[in-house]
């Protein structure tokens, strides 16, 4: 699986995720505005955080 990886204000890069079947994109509102995180897997999230998990290469754009 190939996913985009990104933390907050960084530019998204692609990464290979051995053994993973999902990519995710999650976002929430913070004191600096909307915060976006992308990566491998499909983590559980706290209330108030929106997450979208997907199952194809680079699907978390």
Swiss-Prot record:
An MF annotation (GO) of this entry: acetylcholine receptor inhibitor activity
S-S bonds: 3-23, 17-40, 42-53, 54-59
One of the Pfam families matching this protein, by short name: Toxin_cobra-type
Keywords: Acetylcholine receptor inhibiting toxin, Disulfide bond, Ion channel impairing toxin, Neurotoxin, Postsynaptic neurotoxin, Secreted, Toxin
Domain of life according to the entry: Eukaryota
Keyword Disulfide bond: yes
Subcellular location field: Secreted
The keyword Secreted is assigned to this record: yes
Entry-linked InterPro entries: Snake_3FTx, Snake_toxin-like_sf, Snake_toxin_con_site, Toxin_cobra-type
Gene Ontology CC terms: extracellular region
Signal sequence range: none
Expression (tissue specificity): Expressed by the venom gland.
Recorded family membership: Belongs to the three-finger toxin family. Short-chain subfamily. Type I alpha-neurotoxin sub-subfamily.
Role of this protein: Binds to muscle nicotinic acetylcholine receptor (nAChR) and inhibit acetylcholine from binding to the receptor, thereby impairing neuromuscular transmission.
The protein, known as: Short neurotoxin 4
Organism expressing this protein natively: Naja annulifera
């Amino acid at each position: 699986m190939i996913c985009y990886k990104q933390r907050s204000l960084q530019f998204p890069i692609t990464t290979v995720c051995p053994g993973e079947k999902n990519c995710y994109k999650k976002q929430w509102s913070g004191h600096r505005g909307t915060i976006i995180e992308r990566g491998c897997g499909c983590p559980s999230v706290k209330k108030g955080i929106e997450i979208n998990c997907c199952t194809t290469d680079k699907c978390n754009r």
